[in-house]
Design a protein with these regions (language model features):
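Short acidic-aromatic low-complexity motifs
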Residues: 9-13
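Vicinal oxygen chelate
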Residues: 1-6, 16-111, 120-130
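C-terminal catalytic core of tyrosine-transesterase DNA break-rejoin enzymes
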Residues: 114
Length: 130
């Protein structure tokens, strides 16, 4: 089984552009609606794939601000320092500076343009590191 997070944005096209510039995602597929909004896209970072689209009535309400969301996305990256600098240069709202953790990871956190909380670090879950 695989888990593929799905994120819906008010401006999915803008979000995709930001995720590419700030966090290094690569767009694998993109399908637009007749009105030009993004119906479905697939973005990859390393071995991980997430799906991004435009929020639509009946599908999922897109909040005005994700700052109160109780979920975030954590991605392990190889060159965390370079990733952090790239995110900062692209205008990501860094909410937690680079830091070492007591569980052996180095991490930082940032929000994208619509407030989705992203976490990046060197931690690899134990089940995956075996």
């Amino acid at each position: 089984m695989s888990i593929h997070p799905t994120l819906l944005y008010r401006d999915a096209a803008g979000a995709i552009d930001f995720l590419e510039r700030a966090f290094g995602f690569e767009t694998l597929a993109r399908h637009d609606n007749p009105d030009g909004t993004v119906a479905h896209s697939e973005l990859r970072l390393g071995d991980d794939v997430l799906m991004v689209g435009t929020g639509a009535e009946g599908l999922q309400d897109v909040p005005d601000d994700f700052r109160e969301a109780r979920a975030g996305i954590y991605l392990s990256v190889e060159d965390l320092g370079a990733h952090y600098e790239r995110a900062r240069a692209a205008g990501a709202d860094v909410t937690r500076e680079l830091q070492d953790t007591d569980y052996g990871s180095r991490e930082y956190s940032a929000r994208d343009l619509e407030g989705v909380h992203w976490h990046f670090g060197t931690y690899v879950p134990q089940a995956l590191s075996r």
